[in-house]
Amino acid sequence: MANILENQLFTAAKTIEQQLDQQLDRLDNLDSDDLKVLREQRLREMKDLNNKKQEWLRNGHGTYTELADEKEFFEMSKKSPNIVCHFYRDSTERCKIVDMHLKILAAKHVEAKFCKVNAEKTPFLTQRLRIKVIPTIALVKDSKTKDFIVGFTDLGNCDDFATEMLEWRIAHSGAIDYKGDLMQPPDVKRKPFINRPQKTIRGGYDSDDSDIDLDD
């Protein structure tokens, strides 16, 4: 699975590189009229992006909030195409670490809605997404769960992982716009792993079945 993902990322990177080369070639051959059209196009894109940002902010993006129940989650999934949702439990200390990082990322990535739900108070949603380990972060795009970050295994198996590491991991789902290299994790130093038992809740979790339609 890791090799497949690596090959896919490599292919995507090569495609992007080729597209950039083609764009640079076109820029070299532009005249004044072409440059004017390009500037006008860029202005329209900036205006569209600003309108999107305003809509995102009206829908609660930019802040990390708690959802009261399943109904609020499903309502939000209709308004926000990108969702980063932390399933937590009050008794799990590691959830506080996740809260700290997601609060930072929520302000940085307004294109996604960052939120959390209490797994014990949302049994229907927790079982539907087959959440078993706490903390788990569900990554939703266009009303479909694309990926899950289960515990801290993907974050270096340490409690003091960098926010950039979590950002990089979230970006693999496409739920946020990421400017870095998806093929290379951030170069951060970590302390030795503190082995703590992961909290589990009833129900199963299957990481291979990650494309669950929330509209059903």
Swiss-Prot record:
GO biological process: chaperone-mediated protein folding; microtubule cytoskeleton organization
Tissue expression profile of the protein: Highly expressed in germline cells of the testis from the spermatogonia stage until the early spermatid stage but is no longer observed in late-stage spermatids in the distal end of the testis.
Knockout or disruption consequences: Viable, but males are sterile with seminal vesicles of reduced size and lacking mature sperm. Sperm fail to mature past the canoe stage. RNAi-mediated knockdown in male germ cells results in disrupted spermiogenesis.
Domain Phosducin: 29-163
Domain of life of the source: Eukaryota
Single GO MF annotation: protein folding chaperone
Cross-referenced InterPro entries: Phosducin_thioredoxin-like_dom (IPR024253), Thioredoxin-like_sf (IPR036249)
One Gene Ontology term, aspect cellular component: cytoplasm
Coiled-coil features, chain-numbered ranges: 13-59
Entry's EC annotation: 1.8.1.9
Family, as annotated: Belongs to the phosducin family.
Name of the protein in its database record: Phosducin-like protein 3
Organism phylogeny: Eukaryota, Metazoa, Ecdysozoa, Arthropoda, Hexapoda
Gene that encodes the chain: PhLP3
